[in-house]
Structures are given as structure tokens and as C-alpha cells.
Swiss-Prot record:
GO cellular component: extracellular region; host cell endomembrane system; host cell plasma membrane; membrane
Family: Belongs to the RxLR effector family.
Role noted for this protein: Effector protein that contributes to pathogen virulence. Targets members of the RABA GTPases subfamily to inhibit vesicular secretion, leading to an accumulation of secretory proteins in the endoplasmic reticulum.
Compartments, as annotated in UniProt: Secreted; Host cell membrane; Host endomembrane system
Region feature (RABA-binding domain): 109-159
Subunit structure, as described in the record: Interacts with potato RABA GTPases including RABA1a, RABA2a and RABA4a.
Species lineage: Eukaryota, Sar, Stramenopiles, Oomycota, Peronosporales
Source organism: Phytophthora infestans (strain T30-4)
Protein name: RxLR effector protein 24
UniProt keyword annotations, A-Z: Host cell membrane, Host membrane, Membrane, Secreted, Signal, Virulence
Signal peptide: 1-18
RxLR-dEER (motif): residue ranges: 58-82
Length: 159
């Protein structure tokens, strides 16, 4: 079973790390590096060492000195995917996280209501879990959550 999980994890990492990039220079009519003269190379190196001014700005996706939020040049900046993971994968992950959080909140609500019906108070829960002594961290977290829920239930419900 561990081997199967390991194979799945390696496959997932391989899938996520695969990238495909296409250079815009390959399809453009700009001169290639073999066509540059010494004067062009000198100009380029001077531009690279300029610290201030407009020449220091880098436009990685186009050669236009336009606002990067506008997509009226041929680079279509707004439509480009820039994350490590595609947006479909991140949407699936966020849906799974939200579903898990909702399920967990419902389960805690039901458990706390059951505990209250059985007559459990924060004081009796603290005694039973030995809060203040050598209690485990998870017990302290349950106690804190139940106490907050119990106080909220009794103040909001008006009972």
C-alpha cells in the first residue's frame, strides 16, 4: 500500500512539474543573436547595467513599453496562465479544502450538541480531560472549541 501511494505521489509530482514554453522570439521578425553587430551588443550590455529609468524595466512577455495590465499588444498579458499549477487544479484543491472544512464544522457541531444533551459543561469536560494538568494538546484544543461553542450557544440562543 505504501508503494502504491509512493507511485501516485511520484506521478503527481511528475505531472505538476512538466512545463511547456514557447518563445515569442521564434515567431517574430526581430534579428536573432547571430545577426547582431558589435554596436548592437554594446548597446544591449549598456541597457542591462542601467539601474534607474525606463531602460531598467524588463518586459519579459513583450517588447512594448506599455502598461502591463493592458492587453492591447500581441502578448495578451491578462489571459496568460502564470501560476505553478493550472487554475483548474487550484480550483479543485480549493473546492476540496472548502468541502473538508464544511464537513468538519458540521461534525463538530453535531458532536458538541450531543455532548451538551448528555449534560457536558466546559467545567466537567475540563475535569474529564485533565485540562490544567498533563493534558495533550488536542484535548486542550477540543476543550477550547467546546467552551467557545458552549458560551456562544447559551448567549445567542438565550437559554
Amino acid at each position: 500500500m505504501r508503494f502504491l501511494v509512493w507511485v501516485f505521489f511520484v506521478g503527481l509530482v511528475t505531472f505538476v512539474s512538466g512545463t511547456h514554453a514557447i518563445s515569442k522570439l521564434a515567431n517574430s521578425n526581430e534579428p536573432q543573436s547571430t545577426q547582431l553587430t558589435m554596436k548592437d551588443i554594446d548597446t544591449l550590455t549598456r541597457l542591462l547595467f542601467v539601474e534607474d529609468g525606463d531602460a531598467a524595466k524588463r518586459f519579459l512577455r513583450s517588447n512594448a513599453n506599455q502598461d502591463l495590465t493592458t492587453a492591447n499588444d500581441d502578448s495578451d498579458v491578462k489571459e496568460e496562465e502564470r501560476g505553478l499549477l493550472p487554475s483548474k487544479v487550484t480550483n479543485l484543491i480549493s473546492k476540496a479544502k472548502n468541502g473538508w472544512a464544511k464537513w468538519k464544522a458540521n461534525a463538530l457541531e453535531k458532536a458538541f450538541q450531543h455532548m451538551m444533551k448528555q449534560g457536558e459543561t466546559p467545567t466537567s469536560l475540563a475535569k474529564r480531560l485533565e485540562i490544567g494538568g498533563a493534558a495533550e494538546l488536542r484535548y486542550e484544543k477540543v476543550y477550547e472549541k467546546y467552551t467557545a461553542w458552549w458560551i456562544n450557544y447559551h448567549t445567542v440562543a438565550g437559554t
